[in-house]
Every structure is written in C-alpha cells, then in structure tokens.
Amino acid sequence: MIIVTGGAGMIGANIVKALNDMGRKDILVVDNLKDGTKFINLVDLDIADYCDKEDFISSVIAGDDLGDIDAVFHEGACSATTEWDGKYLMHNNYEYSKELLHYCLDREIPFFYASSAATYGDKTDFIEEREFEGPLNAYGYSKFLFDQYVRAILPEANSPVCGFKYFNVYGPREQHKGSMASVAFHLNNQILKGENPKLFAGSEHFLRDFVYVGDVAEVNLWAWENGVSGIFNLGTGNAESFKAVAEAVVKFHGKGEIETIPFPDHLKSRYQEYTQANLTKLRAAGCDFKFKNVAEGVAEYMAWLNRK
C-alpha cells in the first residue's frame, strides 16, 4: 500500500494520478474534506481507501499497524502563505509531520514530503542549505523548521527521507485553493467571464520559477523508485515572468488584453519578487527530468481546464 496525505489536494491528487498511471491503485488517501469540494480531485482516480486526517494522525501517534506500506507521500499541510495563525501552522505543518516521519523511520518506510521555496524568503541563491534560508511568513517558517528537523535526523535514517522545496506549482486539480490557486487559474477564469486578464503593476519584473504539477508528481515518483534521500529544490531551474503566464493564457483563448491593477499593500515586504530553483543538487542525485516551460505547461493546463 502507498499512503498519500493531502491526497485530495492539488499535488497529492496528481501524485495519486501518477501512481495510477504506473498501475498502482492500492493507495490510502488521507485528507481533511471539511471543504467538500475537494472530492472532485479524486473522482477520476482509483484509490483503495480514504482516512480523515485527524483519525490518521491518531493512529500514527498510537503506533497502530497500518499494514504493509511501500511509501508515504506527505503532501498534507496548510499551504496558505497568508495564514498567520502560528499555532495552527506549527501543529498542522510541523508537529503532524514529525509524528509521521518517526512512524516511517521506525518501520523503515520511505518518506517523501512537501517543503517549499517559501523557506528562502527574499534570499536569492536558492541553495538547499540553512545559510541561504530566511522565511518571510509563518507558513515558510513551519516548513523551514521541519527541514531543519529532517537535516538533524538524516544521518541516522535507515530508510529514504526526501523533502522537495516546491517552487510555484500550477496545473490541474487546484480549483479548491481559492486565492492561493495559481495565476494561470485566475487569469483563465477572468477570460471566461469576458474580462481582460489582470496582473499586478510591475509584474513584468516579478520572475518566478513556475513548475507544472504533473512534473512535480513525476519527480516524486522518481525519488521513490530510486531510494533518494535529502532535501531538494523542485522547480524548472528557469525563472519566467507573470506576463509570460498571462501571454500563454491569452494565446490559448485567442482573446484578451493584459491589464494591470495596483499591487496590494498587505503583500508588500512579504512577497517573493524572484524565485529560481538551483537544480545542482537534484541533478547530482541523478534526476535528468526535462521540465515543461511556461508556454508548454500553461498550454497543457488550459486544455485540461477548458476540456468539454
């Protein structure tokens, strides 16, 4: 059996799809479906069972026998960079992750988890070491602290433990994320409503490493199949502008002119203007995966979003 926490979320559901594509259906999805709309992410996927997050973590803490587990993909977390309830974030993103990590270590179950480029804050080297990290928000700090915890235990681990610092992930199965959904998602909705796509003023200068979620899922499976341990950046290694995303959306629809809107005050000083994954460590680990660029990934995503 394979466990995917956050399996009804964007990245988790895409990992489930990638597992299905390789013939695996013996999958336990763990999630919190208080937001019932997330069920749609699982409708076309094959899983063996579902477990509520709270029930699952209770079983983990109790040390219950969950069966023969081949791997755990831990994608469940609060991913809102605008969330400032630190107690909630630390419980959900840090304490929960530690419990599951130790459950896996004790049983030598390969453990793969979601970290984030938010751990870097406004630092621009994007190298997977503590000296290059400095989160700007509580979400980033919760992910940073778990990375630090993993670094401390890695030398003694007898089974794979692998974290991925996700950069700007976009693609299918993100519709439940609301304001935290990707720019491509929001621009598509604007055009469908007959509006012009809107970007923040200055967006031509904001460069991000936009990585397609299908590629993210494939690299997770590569790490599992190759028994990889460590903490790695997961982006394309190439920063592109928000304008490039908008142009790809406009090209798909064949209509719309890009407009600019004022930059929100509440995001100033907490906004990463530039991200670009340094892939040196990932490539050195043997990953030669070819990532989609914005034009390729957004075109595929638009076709998926607008399918009949």
Curated annotation (Swiss-Prot):
Pfam family membership, one: Epimerase
Cofactor: NADP(+)
Source species, domain of life: Bacteria
NADP is among the record's keywords: yes
Entry binding sites for substrate: N168, S179, H186, F200, A201, G202, S203, R208, Y271
UniProt entry tagged with the keyword DNA damage: no
Active site: Y139, K177
Cofactor binding note: Binds 1 NADP(+) per subunit.
Keywords: Carbohydrate metabolism, Isomerase, NADP
Catalytic activity: ADP-D-glycero-beta-D-manno-heptose = ADP-L-glycero-beta-D-manno-heptose
InterPro entries on file: Epimerase_deHydtase, Heptose_epim, NAD(P)-bd_dom_sf
GO molecular function annotations of the record: ADP-glyceromanno-heptose 6-epimerase activity; NADP binding
EC number(s) reported in the record: 5.1.3.20
Residues binding NADP(+): 10-11, 31-32, 38, 53, 75-79, 92, 143, 169, 177
Pathway connected to this protein: Nucleotide-sugar biosynthesis; ADP-L-glycero-beta-D-manno-heptose biosynthesis; ADP-L-glycero-beta-D-manno-heptose from D-glycero-beta-D-manno-heptose 7-phosphate: step 4/4
GO BP terms: ADP-L-glycero-beta-D-manno-heptose biosynthetic process; carbohydrate metabolic process
Assigned protein family: Belongs to the NAD(P)-dependent epimerase/dehydratase family. HldD subfamily.
Entry domain remark: Contains a large N-terminal NADP-binding domain, and a smaller C-terminal substrate-binding domain.
Function of the protein: Catalyzes the interconversion between ADP-D-glycero-beta-D-manno-heptose and ADP-L-glycero-beta-D-manno-heptose via an epimerization at carbon 6 of the heptose.
Subunit structure: Homopentamer.
Protein's recorded name: ADP-L-glycero-D-manno-heptose-6-epimerase
Species lineage: Bacteria, Pseudomonadati, Pseudomonadota, Gammaproteobacteria, Pasteurellales
